[in-house]
């Protein structure tokens, strides 16, 4: 590439032609650099290449495929990291959340600690699981706002509160907002009973969907008060419906299903707040795992 640049500087008459050659040389050099980085990535991660294929002017490496878990274990359990990994799937409902939400948890301890990690034991079982009613019934009569600026409400004292309500209820109610409901959506809300979803609607209420049969069962789901909810996602996009009222679930109601206390305030646009709630790990589940790790750290000290 240095030769092409020198020719470009010295040859004023053919500078345009030389410039094109310089650009091509730079492109070739970048392609080589990218290829070497890919080779380094394969080598660093012990990925076995068992064939190379030339196609469309490029060279493709065929590698053996394996799961993300195997990939992580292969790296973290060996030099230079040397972790002992424990993996399990925990359900938030077993730790006090009023929803069925499974999450894969991986905990790693340095091998030289010689300590065995044990996942936290469930504190709730079938028959004692918390429900949607436990989480949101006390704010049913508070009309949600429609804009982010409408999200502040003062909650009166509730000395009778107990269980989950007592754990989550605050003095102020933030983020209690929903989307404005259009006529078509409202007609669907009114048509659905607790536990029903989009597929239980009559054909005339499905006409705005190009492929209604492929719509997920979680769309237009009306929650059941006396059961745990399903996995909380972005309930605005899924159009989750209040168990008894013909309106969408508010951001705060979804946050309570996730076990966020009222004191936790979500910031950003309405869309962003709904997404933050849907993406989150339930604090009750996170707390259970964190406390189990703290007990390990106490042993180390």
What are these regions (language model features)?
Residues 1-87, 94, 99-301:
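S-adenosyl-L-methionine-dependent DNA methyltransferase catalytic core
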